[in-house]
Amino acid sequence: MTVKCANDLDTHTKPPFVARMIHRFAVPIILVWLAIAVTVSVFIPSLEDVGQERSVSLSPKDAPSYIAMQKMGQVFNEGNSDSVIMIVLEGDKPLGDDAHRFYDGLIRKLRADKHVQSVQDFWGDPLTAPGAQSNDGKAAYVQLSLAGNQGELLAQESIDAVRKIVVQTPAPPGITAWVTGASALIADMHHSGDKSMIRITATSVIVILVTLLLVYRSFITVILLLFTVGIESAVARGVVALLGHTGLIGLSTFAVNLLTSLAIAAGTDYGIFITGRYQEARQANENKEAAFYTMYRGTFHVILGSGLTISGATFCLSFARMPYFQTLGVPCAVGMLIAVAVALTLGPAVLTVGSRFGLFEPKRLIKVRGWRRIGTVVVRWPLPILITTCAIAMVGLLALPGYRTNYKDRAYLPASIPANQGFAAADRHFPQARMKPEILMIESDHDMRNPADFLILDKLARGIFRVPGISRVQAITRPDGTAMDHTSIPFQISMQNAGQVQTMKYQKDRMNDLLRQAENMAETIASMRRMHQLMALLTENTHHILNDTVEMQKTTSKLRDEIANFDDFWRPIRSYFYWERHCFNIPICWSFRSIFDALDGVDQIDERLNSIVGDIKNMDLLMPQMLEQFPPMIESMESMRTIMLTMHSTMSGIFDQMNELSDNANTMGKAFDTAKNDDSFYLPPEVFKNTDFKRAMKSFLSSDGHAARFIILHRGDPASVAGIASINAIRTAAEEALKGTPLEDTKIYLAGTAAVFKDIDEGANWDLVIAGISSLCLIFIIMLIITRAFVAAAVIVGTVALSLGASFGLSVLLWQHILGIELHYLVLAMSVIVLLAVGSDYNLLLVSRFKQEIQAGLKTGIIRSMGGTGKVVTNAGLVFAFTMASMVVSDLRVIGQVGTTIGLGLLFDTLIVRSFMMPSIAALLGRWFWWPQQGRTRPLLTVAAPVGLPPDRSLVYSD
C-alpha cells in the first residue's frame, strides 16, 4: 500500500473556467491591461497631481477643537476655516521704524487679498504690541486666518498666495519674513510627500530588481515580473486617480504614498506566488499547461484572499473619523482590488505567453531539504518551538510598555522646507509655544463689557495661568500676557491720593502761615499789655485832670462873675468906645474896646469849661470801664494764640501722617504694578470709554461683547504628551473659575495645537479600535471562508495579532531606543491596519498548502507544505518587507516609520510566525486545527499506484 496525496487525486481534474479563458486569451488580456494602463497614464492626471487637486481636509469635523475653531471664526468674523499661519519678522538687530513700515505695508496687502480671511494685527497696535514681539526685540509675528481647511487645495493656494505677497514685498536690509505655522507645515508636508514619491518608487524598483535577480537568476524573468508589477501599479494608481479626479473620493499624501508602495509590494508578492508555484509544478515534471493550471489552482484563492484581506482591512479605515486614516480607506481598497484583478489575469497571461518561449522555466532546482528539516523539527518538537517563538515575540512585546509617541510634526519633516525654516527662526527669539497657541473662548448671553464681568474674565485668565505647564495667558485684562499696568486696586487707591499729594504743599504752607500769625498775635498781645498799662496811667491822669478842670471851672466862674461886676460898672464908659466912629483910628480907644471885647470871651470860656468838665467826667467814668476790658481781651488773644499753635502742631502731625500714608500707598501701588500682581484687578467704568481700550477689546471680545477669548501659551511644546494632557486641566480651570459667578452657564470652547492633537489622539485610539476590530473580523471571515476551518482561521488571526504587537514593539525598539526618535502618532494606526491585512497572506498560503497536503497526514502535510512553500513565501515576504521599508527614503519621516514598521512586521511574520509559530500550533492542535472539519492525522491508505503513474512530486525535490 502507498500513500496517495491530494495532488495526485487532482491530476486529471478539469481546469477552472477562468484559468482556461486566461490561458486561451492570454495575449488579448495583456493588450487590454496594457491599453488600460496607457489610457489612465496619458489621459488622466498623475495620482500626485490628483492628490493635490482633491486633497481633503485633515481636520476631523466632529472634533471639539474643530467645532471650537469654527465657532470662534463665526463669532469674531474671522473666517470659517481652521487654516491658520504665522508670518514671522526676524531682524539682525532690534526691529525699528523701517521694520514697522515694512510690516504695515505687508498687512495692507494681506488684508486686500481674497485668500486672507482675517489678520490678528497685534504688533501694529501699541497696546498689544509687546505681546507679539520677542524679548530681545529682534522678532515679531502676525497671525492670519486663510481660506480653506488644512490639507485642502484651497488652503494650499491660500498659503502660496501669502508667500507670493511676502516675496514680492521688499524687506528692509537685515530683515527676513518667514511664513510658518501649522497650516504651512501641512502644505509643505504634501509637497515633500509628493516629491518623495519618485524616490520611493525608484528605490522600491531597485530593491525588487536586486531581490528577484538573486532569487530567479534570470534577467528576463525579473523584467517580465516587473512589467506585470508596473502594469498593476499604473492601473491601480490610474483608476484611483480617475476616481479622485471625478470627485468621487478624496486623497491625501499618506494615501498616495501608501497605495503606491502597497501596489508595488503586493503585485510583486503575487508575481512571486504565481511564478514560484509554476516553477514548482514544472520541476514536478508537469507540462507547461498542466503546471499553469496547477499554479492557478494553488494561488488563485490565496491571491484573492490576500487581496480581499488587504483591501477589506484598509477599507475598514473608512469607518474611522480621523481624515488621516479615513482617506486611506477607499483609495487603498480600490487600488488593491485593481491590483488583485490585474494579478489574477495579467500575471497568468504573461506567464502563459512567456512560458511558450521558456522564459519562466526554473534555472535551478528549488531547494526544499532545508525547509523540510525545519518542518520536521517543528512537528517533532512543536511545544519547544512555540515557546521559543513566543520568547522571540516577547522581545518586541516587552518594548511596547515603553512606547512614547510624538506629536511634533515639524520633527518629521526636512529642516529645509520653508515652514520649518520659519519655525527655526521663531525658536531663535520666542518660546516654542508662541507659534502654536491654544485659544479658549467663552460665550455668554449678555454684553460682558462692564467692570463686574471683567473681574470674572480676569479671574478666568488667572485660573488658566495657574495651570501647571502654562507660561502665558493673553486676554482683554492682560493684552500682553501679564497683568495690565495700573489695574490693581492698591495702585488705583494710590492714584486717589494723587490730588491730596499735590495739594499737600499748599496746605503745609497755609499751616506755616498760622505759625506766623501766632507770632504776630504774640506781638499784638504784648502791645495790648503795654496799652493796658498806659491806659491805667491815662485813667489816673484823666481823674486828676477832672479834678483840676473842676477847680479851673470854679475859678473861671468866679472870674466871670468878677468881670461881670466890672463890666456892669464900666458899661457907660464902654459904650463910648462903641459909639466912637473913629475908634479904630484912635489907638487908646481901640485898645480899650479890644479889652472889653476880650472880657466878653471869659463868659464863653466858662461855658466851654462847663462842657469840658462834663466830658471829662464821662471820660473819668468810661476810662476805668475801658481799662477793665483789656485783661479779658489779652487773655482771649493769648487763648487764640495757644489754640492756633496747637492747631499748627496738630495739623503738622496730621500732614506728616498723611504724607507717610500717601508714600506707603504710592509705594504699595508701585510695588503691585512692578510685580505684575494680578490678585486685585479692577477696571473703573471710565476705562471702557477709552479709545485705545476700545481698540484692544476688538481683539479679545466679539463685536457685541457676548464672547471673549483667551490666547494661552504652554511652557513647553504643546505638541507633546504633557501639552496634550494640560487641555483637560485648562478646561477644568476655566469651569472652576466661572463656578458661582454670573458667567457660570457660559459655553466654553477650546482650540489650538494641543487641543487638536488631543482630539486626534483620542480619535486615533478609537479609530484604531474600530478599524482594528472590524479588520480582524473581516480577516477572520475571509480566512474562515477560504480554509473552511474555524480554528485554523482563529489561529491565523491570533498569530497575526501577536505578530502585530511584537512587530510594533520591534519598531519601538529600533526607532525609539536605538535611533532615539519617537514614533509619530500616525504610525501606530497606519502600520497596524496594514500589518493586519498583509500579515495574514503568508499564513493563509501556508494553511492553504496544509489543506492541499492533508491527505498525506497532518505532520507529513506540514513538512511537505513547508518544503513546498518555504522558499517562495520567504522570498515574497522579503520582497514585500524590503519594498515597504524602501519608504524610509521619503522626506516625510512618518512615511519612513510606517514603512519600516510594516517591513519589520513582515520580516517577523515571514521568518518567525509563518516558519515556526503557525506550523507548531497546527502540530500541537492536530486534527482540532481543522475543526469543524475532520482533519486527517494519518496518511490516506489506498491501493498501490499502477505502473507508469507519475511519482509524487513532493518527493522528487532535491538540494
Curated annotation (Swiss-Prot):
- Spans through the membrane: 25-45, 205-225, 239-259, 300-320, 333-353, 381-401, 766-786, 790-810, 818-838, 872-892, 902-922
**InterPro entries, alphabetized:** MMPL_dom, MmpL_fam, Mycobact_MmpL
Q: Give Gene Ontology CC terms.
A: plasma membrane
Q: Please give the chief subcellular localization of this protein.
A: membrane
| Keywords, ordered alphabetically | Cell membrane, Membrane, Transmembrane, Transmembrane helix, Transport
The membrane topology noted for this protein in its Swiss-Prot or TrEMBL record is: Multi-pass membrane protein
Output the Gene3D superfamilies linked to this UniProt entry: Multidrug efflux transporter AcrB transmembrane domain
What is its subcellular localisation?
Cell membrane
Homology family: Belongs to the resistance-nodulation-cell division (RND) (TC 2.A.6) family. MmpL subfamily.
Q: What is this protein called?
A: Probable transport protein MmpL4
Organism lineage reads as:
Bacteria, Bacillati, Actinomycetota, Actinomycetes, Mycobacteriales
